[in-house]
Amino acid sequence: MKSLIALVRLHKWRIDESTRKLADLDALATRFRQQITDIVDRLAAEARLAGDSVAAAASYSNFMQVETARRRTLEQSLADLDHEIARAREQLAAAFRELKSYEITLDRKRQHASRMNDRRQQAVLDEIGQVLHRAKTAQGRA
């Protein structure tokens, strides 16, 4: 049973680690989404400025190309990250299932040990009762 307790403890630790990893990945995905939103906002703001000024319009094309390339890179990174998050969630779910099976097995072993202990105690009490009954019966005959 000690090895099962150790397995449960190990799997709980693995679940904690997987949960932390998933939280880190989610936080990174949120940062990527925010950066993409910021780029879109900057592009819109610069487009408005480019419409107002000839000098700004000349540099807007280069700015737009750089920011658009940066946005595409972030979007690709976000797509890759979303796949990694999906894998991490699957691994976490599998770890939970495995932990649950170990916990169920441990619980069954504990219940079995408790039943066996109860049987041993009952056998001792039965033996004591028989001894007392014999002594009482023998005393009554004497």
Question: For the regions a protein language model found, what residue spans apply to each?
Answer:
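Charge-rich amphipathic alpha-helical interaction elements
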Residues: 1-142
